[in-house]
């Protein structure tokens, strides 16, 4: 899967957009993490510059996102990006399946979960 932008720019970037669908994997044990945005869904909306609540990023799901899920993208071409944590909007049903891999909707937008790069909390 190709990622738009160059490695250095993306590594230090707050966001990542993909061409087509990518594999996302829910991270386990992240529910106690927080940031100053109020919620991880608000974190995603802030840095994605989204004014309304998005749909769940899981392909085939039409539910509204209820949470900002912590995910990795384990099958990206660039190994350096595979280990980075991202926030993806998800419904609670999909987010409640830790360590599960899902296909994202085409051309999804992910926001870094690295608070030092984003909200500074």
Language-model-detected regions and their locations in the chain:
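Acidic/polar hotspots within intrinsically disordered regions
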Residues: 2-4
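Polybasic, low-complexity binding patches
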Residues: 78-84, 97-121
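N-terminal helicase ATP-binding lobe
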Residues: 37, 56, 66, 84-85, ...
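A boundary/linker detector
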Residues: 6-38
């Amino acid at each position: 899967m190709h990622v738009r932008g160059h490695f250095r720019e993306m590594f230090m970037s707050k966001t990542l957009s993909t061409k087509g669908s990518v594999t996302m994997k829910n991270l386990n044990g992240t529910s106690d993490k927080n940031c100053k945005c109020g919620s991880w869904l608000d974190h995603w909306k802030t840095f994605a510059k989204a004014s309304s609540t998005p749909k769940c990023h899981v392909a085939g799901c039409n539910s509204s996102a209820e949470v900002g899920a912590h995910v990795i993208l384990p099958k990206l071409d660039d190994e350096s990006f595979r280990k980075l944590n991202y926030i993806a909007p998800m419904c609670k049903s999909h987010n409640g399946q830790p360590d599960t891999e899902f296909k994202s909707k085409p051309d999804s937008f992910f926001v870094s979960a690295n608070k030092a790069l984003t909200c500074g909390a």
